[in-house]
């Protein structure tokens, strides 16, 4: 009962509308989707890939939440509402992450191997945010509603917009610090893009 208890408790901690454990267990689609994913992921890891996909697609129909059975999701994750949420095959979601409806943890279609995001402990991804590619969302970072994130987000910052930009660091609107962090982020993003372009060029020769 450890996983169930932890999952129900995190819902009650984060959703004031959750009145009791039975209500959470019976009526919250995020809880059902995460529970189903545990079996899908087990089947996937043990080589029953078609069965895993069929199982995950069945629960996609019932919950409107699509989680690829290959995705790695820790315990203590909260999916609120959940409708339209998509988590790709190589995504990693750590403990204490909050995901809202319409979120996509997706791929660019250009990467191979690790193609989807890693979301570190305690991060929050708001409704309809699109987090794309093999990037990392740092611990306790917050991604605003409708943001499009295509590069790493440092720990304990808030990003908003298209493309996402940093607006708060450690909960404060400290302009010099925000500017410094953004400059570093852009520098490393440019280096990463150049490395990817060089890799694609060499592979096409």
Predicted segments with their positions:
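Terminal amphipathic alpha-helical/low-complexity segments used for targeting or macromolecular assembly
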Residues: 1-63, 174-205
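Structural signal for interior beta-strand "rungs" in well-ordered beta-sheet cores
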Residues: 60-167
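Intrinsic disorder/low-complexity segments
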Residues: 123, 173-174
């Amino acid at each position: 009962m450890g996983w169930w208890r932890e999952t129900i408790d995190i819902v009650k901690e984060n959703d004031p509308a959750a009145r009791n454990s039975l209500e959470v267990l019976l009526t919250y689609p995020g809880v059902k989707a995460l529970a189903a994913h545990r079996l899908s992921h087990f089947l996937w890891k043990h080589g029953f890939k078609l069965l895993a996909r069929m199982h995950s697609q069945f629960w996609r129909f019932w919950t409107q939440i699509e989680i690829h059975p290959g995705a790695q999701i820790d315990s203590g994750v909260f999916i609120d509402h959940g409708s339209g949420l998509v988590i790709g095959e190589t995504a990693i979601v750590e403990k204490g992450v909050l995901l809202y409806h319409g979120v996509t943890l997706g791929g660019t279609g250009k990467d191979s191997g690790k193609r989807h995001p890693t979301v570190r402990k305690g991060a929050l991804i708001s409704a309809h945010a699109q987090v794309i590619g093999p990037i990392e969302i740092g611990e306790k970072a917050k991604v605003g509603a409708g943001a499009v994130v295509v590069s790493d987000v440092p720990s304990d910052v808030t990003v908003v917009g298209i493309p996402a930009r940093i607006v708060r660091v450690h909960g404060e609107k400290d302009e010099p610090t925000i500017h410094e962090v953004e400059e570093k982020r852009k520098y490393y993003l440019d280096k990463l893009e150049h490395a990817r372009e060089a890799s694609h060029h060499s592979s096409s020769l």
